[in-house]
Amino acid sequence: MAYKNASSPHQKQRRTTSQVMVLVILCLIPGVFLQSYFFGYANLIQISLACLAALASEAFILKIRNRPVLNTLKDASALLTAILLAISIPPLAPWWIVVIGTIFAIIFVKQIYGGLGQNIFNPAMAGYVLLLISFPVQMTSWLPVQSLQPFSLTLMDQINAIFTGSTLDGYSVAQLSVSIDGLSMATPLNTVRDALHNGFTVTEIFNSVQFKASSWQQIYWINGAFLAGGLILLFKRIVHWHIPMSFLLGIGIFSFIAFAYSPDLNAPPLFHLFSGATMLGAFFILSDPVSASTTVKGRILYALLIAFIVVIIRNVGGYPDAVAFAVLLGNMCVPLIDYYTQPKVYGGRK
């Protein structure tokens, strides 16, 4: 057997928490860039507001708990939570939406449970669910892509819309959510769900004007960008393959079963894989090492469970996308999954 000679030192240095968080944030850049390119720069404003709220709220609660403030803030975990939440909400949502969600995520989901490494729920998704349930109108006011927007929005228009609810010319967010053909803007998942409830088949929906105006091509590109960033995380071994690959495989299998059973009432697997927050969830949310399962078998079961819930809610639930709800339900099951998937210790009794 041939052995490879390598110079010392042979013990590799482990990455620090801050290095891991920063690398994850960097891998989010392709998806964030395409969001800005297709829908405007308002999402960057939301990210800035969320980061400020995250740092301020974490510093506040750390001060109350008599914990070191600067050293904790340097780990960048609060910034990652803020960015994940900010890119999940509509770009022109009121400024207080992202602030409330971020404060809730940092204080009530992360710090009250003991801080980084102790929270049982994913903070960003818990904050998102709080906002979606509490403010459904603001959380579903999506913009058309810039090529279909009836008004040309400058950066100042977007800033003004976020802080006052209207552009410099007086157009409200509701008016901005209507494309040039007069159709109210909705995500592809929204469009498919609403049309199915109205009795249309999947084939009719995909050929409809409403679906073609729902920016589905841009959403596919954005998911592809998050997939590219996720593959970098896999290559760097920041994320193990078990969770993202099992989740995507589960989405494909479960959606294929539903599509094969009733192709007129269920979207095909490719649509599910590249719509909504599928790729963002697979590589950046489910793979959270704190709230996910810790065993190899457990990670696979955890990801498959979430994939199953996502497909079920998308097909028959009341919400178009279900990644956030599915992740929180999966987080609840982690202790049980870990209990029954612990590897047998050599020499131990079964």
Swiss-Prot record:
Membrane association type: Multi-pass membrane protein
Pfam families, alphabetized: NQR2_RnfD_RnfE
EC number: 7.-.-.-
Transmembrane segments: 20-40, 44-64, 68-88, 89-109, 125-145, 215-235, 241-261, 267-287, 300-320, 322-342
Keyword Membrane included in the entry's annotation: yes
UniProt keyword terms in alphabetical order: Cell inner membrane, Cell membrane, Electron transport, Flavoprotein, FMN, Membrane, Phosphoprotein, Translocase, Transmembrane, Transmembrane helix, Transport
Residues annotated with FMN phosphoryl threonine modification: T187
UniProt subunit comment: The complex is composed of six subunits: RnfA, RnfB, RnfC, RnfD, RnfE and RnfG.
HAMAP family associated with the record: RsxD_RnfD
Stated role: Part of a membrane-bound complex that couples electron transfer with translocation of ions across the membrane.
Name of protein: Ion-translocating oxidoreductase complex subunit D
Native species: Psychromonas ingrahamii (strain DSM 17664 / CCUG 51855 / 37)
